Amino acid sequence: MKNTVCTALMLLMSVCMYAQELYGEYEKKVYVSSQGDSLKYRLLRPEAEKAGKKYPLVLFLHGAGERGDDNQKQLVHGGQMWLNPVNREEYPAFVLAPP
């Protein structure tokens, strides 16, 4: 029983670490208004960002399956699409993902 619990915990920890690596390129940010209200969001910058060049802003609005307030669930399905190296090269953009 003890070995089963240890194995399950190790598996869970490895999955959590993989998720952090997967979305690591998305910067964790927090907007704070002048009234003190805050909004967490994730920002993905263009891979080869050049100073002075303009890039489009993609506002990634997720569905109900990705709702939450942990600032990571919103990336579960569509967030991977923007990390694809081909997409990042072909469509350089800022990707903003609120929770």
Language model segments and positions:
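A domain-start/cap signature at the N-terminus of enzymes
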Residues: 17-57
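Bacterial Sec-dependent N-terminal signal peptides
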Residues: 1-22
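Residue-level marker of positions within ordered structural domains that often coincide
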Residues: 6, 48, 66
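N-terminal hydrophobic alpha-helix used for membrane targeting or insertion
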Residues: 7-9, 51, 81
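Intrinsic low-complexity, intrinsically disordered segments enriched in polar/basic residues
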Residues: 13, 51-53, 97
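Active-site machinery of serine-nucleophile hydrolases
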Residues: 57, 61-99
